Amino acid sequence: MVTVEEVRKAQRAEGPATILAIGTVTPANCVNQSTYPDYYFRITNSEHKTELKEKFQRMCDKSMITKRYMHLTEEILKENPSFCEYMAPSLDARQDIAVVEVPKLGKEAAQSAIKEWGQPKSKITHVVFCTTSGIDMPGADYQLTKLLGLRPSVKRLMMYQQGCFAGGTVLRLAKDLAENNKGARVLIVCSEITVVTFRGPSETHLDSLVGQALFGDGAAAVIVGADPTPAEKPLFQLVSAAQTLAPNSCGAIDGHLREVGLTFHLLKDVPSVVSNKIEKCLFEAFNPLGISDWNSVFWIAHPGGPAILDQVEDKLGLKPEKLRATRHVLSEYGNMSSACVLFILDEMRKASSNAGLGTTGEGLEWGVLFGFGPGLTIETVVLHSVPIKPGPH
């Protein structure tokens, strides 16, 4: 008779969890940041609020965002005028859109990742779905499983209302699932649309206006598994993962789901809270590896906004090129909440390959993925890059 220890050993993978494919997608509707204030104040019938519009214009100008993608078109907003008021009861209509569109966008990202992975979808053993939009039962994880035609026995985990740090959370969970279940292939999907947060401007709540200037829609999917087969192409190894709460940060970033949708609350000192905590997180993550030079690792940082990136850069003495991939994604897509860091991973491995660098991590061996959001919660994931084999010229 076998022992429990023998069963456990047989259940566990040998090697570390590895990212095997990444897929990203956005809605078709693209908004230009430079003209967005005119559009936003027109569509919300707020053009008479000239001082507030000037403030919003400055927010958009300073955002370092060029464009964003949004499911909410002008047509949809005209059909739902309650979305355009600041605090009008509108949750039912918002939910009706979100519960359909969140899984649909997630499906497109998942199909892209599965295509790159190149394996039959029947090999997917686990699904982790993350969104801040549209709670339902059964959830978006179930809808995705049905839309993709995954096996009924696939093991699902649904994460609602996590916020901007959760791109790190899903990787941490996928790591544990892949390493503790031999042969597991975990599909993780972050799908975020601003249908629950879009609202008109208010003179009394400028933090809400900050969200209107920064947030965009997008979905990203990643396949994670340990002990890759010869047919699979590893991109990054997930070496360690940690989550912590920043001290004295209660109320720094909050969201509340109410009849009016999801309201967003932000304190002015968020950039300093993040930058003051980041070094301790990095030290705890990299001390076991003997790494203390933050310019010697590649960076995947959640781009909450330009002020946060500037303060992190300054606090750690990072060279400007360290946050290139992060700033590129912020510029091209805005802040897509949990999906952002997965978009940045995708951008980094593609840019590294296109530039002829030696690894998926800008030619470097070790890297950090850093996410933060409501709590203030911080996720720190240590990544190990994979050598890029030169392709045929």
UniProtKB/Swiss-Prot annotation:
CDD domains per the UniProt record, alphabetical: CHS_like
- One matching Pfam family is Chal_sti_synt_N
Reactions catalysed = (E)-4-coumaroyl-CoA + 3 malonyl-CoA + 3 H(+) = 2',4,4',6'-tetrahydroxychalcone + 3 CO2 + 4 CoA
Active site annotation, chain numbering: 164
Any coiled-coil ranges, and where?
none
| Top-level taxonomic group | Eukaryota
The metabolic or biological pathway listed in the UniProt record of this protein is:
Secondary metabolite biosynthesis; flavonoid biosynthesis
Instruction: Tell me the GO molecular function terms.
Output: naringenin-chalcone synthase activity
GO BP, one example?
polyketide biosynthetic process
Q: Which Gene3D superfamilies match?
A: 3.40.47.10
Its EC number(s): 2.3.1.74
Metal-binding keyword on record: no
Keyword Transcription regulation annotated: no
What UniProt keywords are attached to this protein's entry? Acyltransferase, Flavonoid biosynthesis, Transferase
**Enzyme superclass (EC):** transferase
Q: Into which family does the record put it?
A: Belongs to the thiolase-like superfamily. Chalcone/stilbene synthases family.
Query: What is this protein's function?
Result: The primary product of this enzyme is 4,2',4',6'-tetrahydroxychalcone (also termed naringenin-chalcone or chalcone) which can under specific conditions spontaneously isomerize into naringenin.
Q: Which PANTHER family match?
A: CHALCONE SYNTHASE 1, HYDROXYMETHYLGLUTARYL-COA SYNTHASE
Write down what this protein is called.
Answer: Chalcone synthase LF1
Q: Which organism is it from?
A: Ipomoea batatas
Q: What is the lineage of its organism?
A: Eukaryota, Viridiplantae, Streptophyta, Embryophyta, Tracheophyta
